[in-house]
Amino acid sequence: MIFYVVFYAAAFFLFYHLIDRIVKKNKKSEQGKQGQQNRQNTVIKKSAPRTVRYTTPGNGIWPLFEDALRQHHLLIAGKTGSGKSVVENGIIDTLLHRLPFDKLGNAQMILIDPKGNELYKYAKLPHTLVYAYQPEEMLKALQYAMDLTAERFQVLRETGDDYYNGSDVYVFIDEFADLMTTQGKTVKPLIQRLCQLGRAARVHVVICTQTPIAKVIPTEIKCNFDSRFGLRTRSAQDSRNIIGKTGLELLPEYGEGYYMTPKEESYYKIPYVTKDEIRETIAWWEDQMQQNGLNPRKAA
């Protein structure tokens, strides 16, 4: 009798010990997987951000912004005060510097400025085809961009080429949420079509917004923006909406961000182009307009 008691007690102890080890092993494995998943879903800061400036007469070109200009379309997103305007102005400043005077036509801009106080300073530059801030003007500006794209597709049909062999046109839309709030139903199909056809026509759409939720940027439009600048956000969910992972909510208030394209994803210190540098650039081009008789922007 005692033998059976000891035997069953020992068997129970071994069985319990075995089950305990299996449970702990599974728990440890699960924690490891969860930790790995968290690392994958969190922005990882990378060293050696690109902050070297290529000098040209006057100011210069930031390699980070130069790369942004090579993307098909670009989304710039982050909370108020995170530096969206810094990125946007840096990209435009780089565009103004990367072209020699005799190749002005190689890049032009259509500027849509719902608040009327961010892009107006570039309105009279020879690069600017259209500047719009009133509701009717903004609609006309988008229609102008769509007409230009359609004209380029007609050329593609005639030549049989896959991509338009001509100048790049950048459609900058500041405060995209304001535009969608006031004219969403009207402009949505235009912007969606522009994004879909713009790649082959060398028409690039660059938009700024606080967070690209579906109410602000419908999925049909957002899916065209595979290149993005993610800046500081209010929450982890906002970060996921922008770059598909958390981490932007942990960034400093301004000066740092996450840049993702189909080819790379990297953490960066955002280059800062000062207001004086921007004024200097604009003044230089205004002088060129007077000296060389360049035409000011076209009307919408």
Predicted segments with their positions:
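P-loop NTPase catalytic phosphate-binding loop
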Residues: I2, V6, F12-R157, G166-Y170, ...
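Short, cationic low-complexity segments
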Residues: Q290-R297
